[in-house]
């Protein structure tokens, strides 16, 4: 970082301009799965006419001017899309982006994205943004762009399973506890104690937009949510799943695989042709379930939480 501050920067980090949206979308399209979050916000800007303050441009010196060479989303999470043609350019670009992030951006709740870029940037900004509360350097990025592979019948004769469907606001009080349980296990803190209003607003928005799925069944004699998942990001023809969850007392009975098949079919038919997700590399049961229904490994992600 010190070297990047002393030398003349070849790249700048500054708010994205409207005239750059088309070029930014083209950069993101080079890897639509990895770029789904920035793409979502760029597409929102196109539809709404409002350019989010979280969108930042990485510009490279080119003659007397500068040209767009990367895109950064800095909202609750930080994601950098930094295509590079060679190692020298990549190192220069990342050094300048790290310096720009430290000097111009607020520290996010997490850094998330393609592992190579995310880990490189984290190594450069750690003295300023650290320490990390949670470090997940190896996450498997997966995607499916075909019909899912249907698995065998679920061991669920006693569960009174209803069909997997999109949640409505009438389901909200049942869905919320499942989402909170998943969030605590995945992120490590209770969103109802820290940022409750924003968390609930976000969940309601997903429900209203038809991006939350659930399944009811019977648990200990009571009707309850037994499976759920949401589309956390949507852009560039990619729907990124988050929060794939099965009721703890029912795990190992095939509900995740059957539920995922239904979610994939519905999503690919009505929302986006490609469905993606990422998962910790040590979560072998989840990876096995995803591969069983047809997800393929397409890359590696990394997450740094603060």
Where is each model-derived feature located?
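Short amphipathic alpha-helix that is part of the acyltransferase structural core
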Residues: 1-38, 150-192
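Conserved donor-binding loop and adjoining core beta-sheet/short helix segment
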Residues: 9, 15-16, 26-32, 40-110, ...
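Acyl-donor-binding surface of acyltransferase catalytic domains
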Residues: 62-63, 75-160, 304
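Acetyl-CoA-dependent GNAT
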Residues: 63-64, 72-77, 187-188, 194-242, ...
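Conserved acetyl-CoA-binding loop-helix of GNAT-fold acetyltransferases
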Residues: 89-100, 242-248, 252-269, 287-292
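Conserved GNAT acetyl-CoA-binding A-motif
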Residues: 105-115, 238, 267-278
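Conserved beta-strand-loop-alpha-helix junction that forms the acyl-donor binding cleft
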Residues: 112-118, 248, 277-287, 304-306
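Conserved active-site alpha-helix within GNAT-family acetyltransferase domains
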Residues: 116-135, 257, 281-299
């Amino acid at each position: 970082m010190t070297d990047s501050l002393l030398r003349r920067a070849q790249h700048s980090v500054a708010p994205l301009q409207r005239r750059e949206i088309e070029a930014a979308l083209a950069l993101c399209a080079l890897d639509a799965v990895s770029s789904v979050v920035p793409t979502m916000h760029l597409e929102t800007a196109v539809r709404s006419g409002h350019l989010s303050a979280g969108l930042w441009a990485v510009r490279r010196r080119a003659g007397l001017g500068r040209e767009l060479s990367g895109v950064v989303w800095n909202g609750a999470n930080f994601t950098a899309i930094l295509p590079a043609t060679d190692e020298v350019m990549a190192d220069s670009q990342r050094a300048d982006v790290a310096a720009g992030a430290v000097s111009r951006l607020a520290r996010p709740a997490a850094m998330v994205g393609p592992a190579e870029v995310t880990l490189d940037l984290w190594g450069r900004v750690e003295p300023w943004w650290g320490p990390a509360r949670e470090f997940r350097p190896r996450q498997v990025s997966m995607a499916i762009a075909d019909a899912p592979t249907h698995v065998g019948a679920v061991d669920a004769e006693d569960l009174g399973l209803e069909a997997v469907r999109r949640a409505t606001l009438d389901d909200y009080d049942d869905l919320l506890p499942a989402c909170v349980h998943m969030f605590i296990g995945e992120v490590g803190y209770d969103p109802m104690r820290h940022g409750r209003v924003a968390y609930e607003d976000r969940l309601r928005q997903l429900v209203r937009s038809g991006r939350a799925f659930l399944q009811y069944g019977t648990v200990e004699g009571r009707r309850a949510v037994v499976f759920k998942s949401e589309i956390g990001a949507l852009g560039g023809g990619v729907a990124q799943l988050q929060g794939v969850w099965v009721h703890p007392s029912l795990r190992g009975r095939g509900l995740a695989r059957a539920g995922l098949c239904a979610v994939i079919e519905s999503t690919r038919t009505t929302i986006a042709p490609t469905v993606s997700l990422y998962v910790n590399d040590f979560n072998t049961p989840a990876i096995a379930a995803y591969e069983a229904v047809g997800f393929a490994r397409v890359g590696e992600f990394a997450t740094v939480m603060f």
